[in-house]
Amino acid sequence: PALLAHDKNELDLAQDFVVFSPSTDIDPDPVSSPNDPGSFRDLVYPESHAPQVQKSSDLVPTADLQARQRHIQLIRATKINPSDLQAWLDLASHQEHLVSPAVDASSMINSERKTLADLRIAVYEKALKQFPENEAPLREELLLRLLSEASITLEAQKYKQKLQDTLQQHLTSFPIWTLYLNACQANPVEFRFEDVKVFFIRSLRTLGSNNNANHNLEAQHMILYLTLRYTFFLRDTGYVELSIATWQALCEYHLFRPEHLAHLGRDFILADFEKFWESERPRFGEEGARGWCIHDQDDGIDPELRSILPDGKLASSLPFKSFSTLENTMNELLRFPGRTMDQPGNEDPFHVVFFSDLQEVLAATTSALSRDGFLDALFCYLGLPEMNDTTITQRLPASRRRWRNDVFLDHGLLHSDLAISDHSNLDENLMPCYQTSTDLLFSRAFQGLSRSSTPSDGSSHDQQTKPDVARFAQRILSSLVQLYPSDDGLAEYYLAFQLSCFPSEASRVAKKILKQRPSSLRLYNACATIEAKLGKTDKAIQIWTGAIKMKASFSAAAQQEFVLLWRGLIWCDLETNNAETAVSHLASFGCGDASIDSES
């Protein structure tokens, strides 16, 4: 008690008043301010080294103020250098920080998105004035971004009109055409088959009537791209016969045109082609097809009556199952265009394709088309990979590569059945999109196709290419190889297809083509590769070594492909576990055929 009294007395003497802070602010935080005298920080830090803690009012400018300051800097950059595209793009991108500071664009509400789109459109329109017409790539970049924002602010019909107006000034712009086609074809609300079909025909006519179409390679490939989109659209909407017939007609028209028509007008050429088509002789890809030019010289035999009536009937006990089976059978039998003499056993008015159904497309594509681009578009439609020819790839414009990446062109004719029957494996059946080589052609380029022309278990859902479609593609490639006897790359491509789809026939076909072209080292390598893939290693090595020994008999141009023989031979050694032989061949590469002679 005495101690307590002593403490109380000292407290009363020393603290008989209350000390207030000089500041008039009232701190709601019960914790002592770090700058208060006598605080813990005064004991740890000397006064001159105490850390300064800023209040919220003293922090750097807010996010809104930062965004405005950055906006001023970007505007200044565009004024200093108006031709700097990146400065304009940065300014447009920054607009989202003005609309909603410190908030990600994905979290914006619809009204904020439209406001942002309007701001960016204004930036792009101002930027376009700074770039003249001769700077097409820069203007195209700005236009694509402007159209992307316009799709947010404009109604569907106005957006399509905006795209159409833009296309009038940029008829050969592949990205803008793609946007336009997607807007017209992929609108589920306003989709009408006839409207979309008319749209494609009108677009082909517009592009085909361009005066520069005959000389502009990009314009030619845009015509091919439109044709691909049109025929894929027909096939996907159930008009398979018209889709296939369109490509048959285009191939006959552009690849097998009679020579005496070369200098005549379009109307005369179309009239002559009408006679050929309405004669109903075998057409491109069909059995017995010889081409428009051959038909023009030889009338041949009248077409035979074909009966394609299905054998199955509806079962009263299982009506739905039997109907499904019969429907699948009819789809396979009626897949390809029919003839008026056929007996399809139904009342399908679209099974027979007349010239009048094709006339508008042919008239719109009468301009000369590049052979390389045309063949690649045809292969894309069939679902085949690109050809192995780096020189062609370097010569073709970017649009040829782009249509290989188009989501609307993912599944070609050879893959269409797989896409319908098994949706779980769509990604596995996509067309390969990469630059092929000889090794890839004979390994995985055709891996999505069947290695057999008949289903393994008879199941309608077997993951294999339908025999009739594979045979159709086979006849097309065979006709092209005969049409271009000097194109060894095309012949190699055909043999790789044979190995994948019809392996039992591949060796015989390879020997036949090699006999016709005995000076092609590429075809020697293809023949040997086929034998090796079929398990006939000794025969493959015999072909490789025999061709290597004949090196001196080949021309200098042909010897440029001599490396293919050595490469194939060495890989064959490795795959058969003959490492020492492979090393020996690798060491003697380029030194003639001494090592081959010593082994034999």
Task: State the predicted function of each range.
Residues 1-600:
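Polyampholytic low-complexity alpha-helical segments
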